A protein has these predicted regions:
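Helix-rich C-terminal "cap"/substrate-channel and partner-interaction subdomain
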Residues: 1-167
Length: 167
């Protein structure tokens, strides 16, 4: 399901694959690089390596459980500014802190990214996500030191996309 190739210049590339085999893919690329570089063989550790955010115990009833171990860091954000505990819309379970977190730590750069991918709000309730977009844009603009023009552009772009999700 994946291939490791070496170009004439020695560039190692991996093609194909899927999320469920990323550990094997990593092993194959590292082993190929070690051989190409004349390095000693070393046993692969990816099988036992936890991915970022791993949490050994998950309470699926806890708000934000899907952030794993990062959920504690989001709670710390809230402890520094209680207003970040507020939800972004009454019909959505997401907090201001989750938006701020995504900008500061996940390279979230657009309102669409925040509402479609970081929170899935667009998929869960398109109408509510459209209504939440101005607040989300404002939070993001503050975090990124951007002004009203950016907010306006983001809202136009997001509304254009989000209206395709309305019934």
């Amino acid at each position: 399901d994946h291939s490791v190739i070496i170009s004439g210049a020695g560039l190692i590339s991996i093609l194909g694959g899927k999320w469920t085999t990323y550990r094997k893919m990593a092993e194959d690329v590292v082993n190929t690089a070690a051989i190409q570089g004349g390095l000693a063989y070393k046993e692969c550790v990816t099988e036992e390596l936890s991915i970022h955010g791993n949490s050994p115990v998950t309470d699926f009833e806890e708000p934000g459980y899907y952030y794993g171990s990062d959920n504690n860091l989001i709670a710390q954000l809230i402890s520094t500014d209680n207003s970040l505990a507020e939800i972004i819309h009454p019909q959505l379970p997401y907090t201001k802190a989750q938006i701020v977190w995504s900008v500061r730590n996940e390279l979230c750069m657009t309102v669409e990214d925040a509402l479609a991918r970081r929170t899935r709000a667009l998929l869960l309730d398109a109408k509510a996500s459209i209504e939440a977009a101005p607040l989300v844009a404002s939070l993001m603009a503050t975090e990124m030191n951007l002004g009203q023009e950016w907010i306006k552009e983001q809202l136009i772009s997001y509304n254009k996309t989000a209206h395709n999700y309305l019934p």
